[in-house]
Amino acid sequence: MPDVITRFAPSPTGHLHIGGARTALFCWAFARAEAKRRGGDARSTFLLRVEDTDQARSSEQAVAGILEDLAWLNIHWDEGPRIGGTGFQPVAGAQPPTAIGGDARRVGPFFQAQRLAIYNQYIDWMLGHDLAYPAFDTAEQLDAQRKAAADRKHTYRYKRDASYDRDAALARLRAGEPCVIRFNNPDAPVHVADAVLGDITFEPEHIDDFVLRKADGFPTYHFAVVIDDELMGVTHILRGQEHLNNTPRHVALQRALRRADTDQPFRTPVYA
């Protein structure tokens, strides 16, 4: 049987909250239970990844707090930022645990801010296959588009205009003009197989040409999570109900990346 790999990937923009701790516990417990159920040489890995692409709100203090809280809860990750050992005390007076984390499979680094070169490689692949494109809309233009949609009582959905000049846009990108990179959504239904909710179909109008890379050069959550889950070999994704509507974007991206002549298969993990 293949290995089971789960992950918990918090954003260090504040304290670990009860919902995040619950998700981490489920991911940890599922990995441990699957290894026991399968027996023999079956292996499971619970990894911790820090999604710190929001540079304005992320902080080292929040990272330290999240890691210490998880360690205090005895939710110990197999791979991820290494902490513990001599001198580590998650709460006053506590005994330091054995070292937690590491990179046995060499899939790190585990901080997304340290993985920008990796994301840019996949952005380049997608640009080369017209699966992504530069967009130069100003904030005022986007606000006007949203207002026009609201006036028509339509849900706002960004789509590339039929008059879009791809060659000219790529030239502007190469010249260093500030822009975002958007996903060229193929307008096809997306089918999500959820282990808890069953099969769900999302129609094209639920997915727009969402941003993959922001103007500051950092990836969005949607892009980075798909790349990292693939490269880190994540097989099962347990997430809160609030992330259900994000899933079709991720499945659509996985499908597109399978077509982008990359060096990865971009398998769709089990969602629950």
Short names for language-model regions:
Residues M1-A149, D216, N245-F266:
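N-terminal Rossmann-like or analogous alpha/beta NTP/dinucleotide-binding catalytic cores
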